[in-house]
Amino acid sequence: MYAVTVRTRGKVERERYESLREALVAMGRRAYLLEHEDHTGAVGGRILRRFEPVSQVVGRIELRGPRRLRAGLDVRGDGSTEAFRGRVRRSLIVQRRGESAFAALERELTA
């Protein structure tokens, strides 16, 4: 059993899937939608530190599975994405030339 958790702007949605393939398809669909949403601009300024869109995580898609599988995607305020493994100790998944963050995540999990 695989669980996909989507966190966006204070909302949390959870879904369960029987196979890794189904979970990855659902993650890819949600990541695509988040990447192409209209995101906020920079926040903060005079008193607080200014956060540019690339520094803001506007959506996070997390995957949990058997044998302590933990991985996911962060969608940034500028629409860029990063793939990671782990939960507490996250490590970024390096993308190959021309590869999307989702493709890198899929490659890492299905290898």
Name these PLM-found stretches.
Residues 1-13:
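Short aromatic-glycine-(Arg/Gly/Cys) micro-motifs in beta-strand/loop hairpins
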Residues 10-22:
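A short, exposed loop/beta-hairpin motif centered on an aromatic-Gly-Thr core
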Residues 19-35:
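A short, charged, amphipathic alpha-helix used as a generic interaction element across diverse proteins
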Residues 36-111:
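Short, mixed-charge low-complexity intrinsically disordered segments
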